[in-house]
Amino acid sequence: MNVTKLNLNAPSQGDPKELQTHFIVNKNKSQYVKFPSLQDRNAVDSFHEFLCKYNVWKTTDRVILTEKSFKYEPSSCFSDISFMITFYDIFCRAKEESIKKQKEQINIVKPNNYPTGFQHVHVSQQIQHDQHPQYNKHPQNNHHPQNTQHSQNNPIDKNINESENKEDLSDRSSDSANSEESHNSQYSQDSGDSRNYQDSEDNKGNIPTGKKTEQNKLIVQRLTNPKITPDTINDSNKDSNKDLNKDLSKNQSGESIKDKSKGPSKNLSKDSSKNKSKETSGSNLPDKISEDGDDLDDLGNDIDNFMDSSDYEDSDQDAISENPSDFDEDDSDDDDSNTEILEQILEISDNEHMELSSDLLEELNKKSPSNSKKSKTNQKLSQSSKKISSKTITNSGSKSQKQEPSTFSVKLKGKVSNGKTNKKTGKNIEESDWENSQSDSDHSESSDDSDNESDNESDNESNNDSDNETDSEIDDDKNNATPNIKLIKKSKKLSPKTPMKPNNKTTSVSKPVSKPPVKSSIKNNTKNNKPVPKPIKNPKKLSKQKDQSESQSDKDIDTDSENLPVSKKPPTNKSQVPKRPVGRPPKSVSLPSSPKKPKRNIGGSKTAKTQNKSKSQPKTNGSKTSTKSIPGSKAVGKKKPTKK
């Protein structure tokens, strides 16, 4: 534990007893904290309780009590505290300061509140409204202080503004509508026309649409023509209300309203004009309506009558009762059904005084059958598209299978792009297809190879037995299997390491491979020792010749693989490897050396049974081999030393 002196300066004035007791906390051997307020043992206990609440310091830390002045070192009276000490004094002082700051912020916010500026504006508005008693009657219009200036200057604008304000408020809520009625009743009592106003409100729902449109026309004329005063409108409204009370069914009242609205009216007071302008505004009609309002209302009435008529319902039932299958069978049925529907529409239009133009009828006749034809053609197209899509799927699958060997061969030839080989070497792809067809169909190959074996056996039955033939076939497999492995290893070594020559090897890749298969097939036939035209008379020499043929055939294939062009190596197809029979030993699982070999080397000729025999049976009859291996081996043996 580190005990250090207090780093405080002595007080300038006063006794050192003022700062008599202090605590020094040694935290992490470097930080020292003072607590000048803890002067008693009771203070230490209270401090202990405080620290127990918050659990801040470790048990290894200690509290040092000093009872001397600053100039002296602290005494050795230590009290171990089993907790960690926080800055108790600093905490208390910070708490007091935070409380003071909060109080100061509250006092600062009060005089500078934002709503004070708005309150002054609002008070000024209230003073203006108090000066105008009109708006005291209408407290809802207090949010329009600009209307006061216009209303004092123009009485017409005053009435318009009042009516517009009332319509807006009536649409917002039902309370505003009730307040309008109360205020309107006050105006009507002042003018003495309250009875007419109540009658007009009772008859608002009974006004037909034609008369409403006439009233709206007058309002539009009043807005467009400044010469027309609201008195003329009020006269027409008053007379119309009287006529409606007498006879609502007569249509001549509309004409009388028009005639009376043209005449001048001079006897009505200003209060009555206000009342009548409010009557028009009370009926929730817009102020501005187009001059074609009569035509729209008449057309709406005709449509309502048409919907209510019995002919319309009968026509719907007739159209629904028809079988939907009749419309889909033939185009002639569609034409008949369309003509029937058009006749029904014409009858309905004659009854309801509606006219259809000849152009519309021609368009209906043209459109209806064409739509049915389009639907049928769309169905046919959808079916044909499904068939085509199924064909394309099968074709794409077959093409992808056929193009696999070509892409693999290109990788071995020298990393040439797939597009060039597919465009230029069309024949190369066909030959690889021939190989894939043989490798995919193992059963067909085995059947073909059985026929070839039967032919070869018929040639060899005169000199050899059936046992000798099976042994010779097994030996041929071994002779053919081991050189294939060497070819594949060398081709794998040559293909990645050979540098790309831009002109020579790409031309060798792009050349068609249709001509070389003839020569290579002749060489492969000589190597594989298949065409045996001549029988052998001395079977004793076969064992020696067999050993020579194995060694020479290995050398031949090594030198031939070096002399072959690059285009003859790639046919080692990885796609053909998993299709080999399972029982073949790992040495014979090799890939074919060239794509030009006949069917027998690709893999279906020998079954798993004969291959298992090749593992199990020893070479008992080494001398009794078939005559296939001799002529090829002799010929190759003579050629080799000259090439080397």
Swiss-Prot record:
It comes from the Viruses. Transmembrane segments: none annotated. Residues 133-155, 367-400, 496-531, 585-594 have a biased composition (Low complexity). Residues 175-191, 216-233, 607-630 have a biased composition (Polar residues). Residues 292-301, 310-338, 447-476 have a biased composition (Acidic residues). Residues 159-174, 192-204, 236-249, 256-279, 544-558 have a biased composition (Basic and acidic residues). Residues 123-644 are annotated as: Disordered. This is Uncharacterized protein R627. It comes from Acanthamoeba polyphaga mimivirus (APMV).
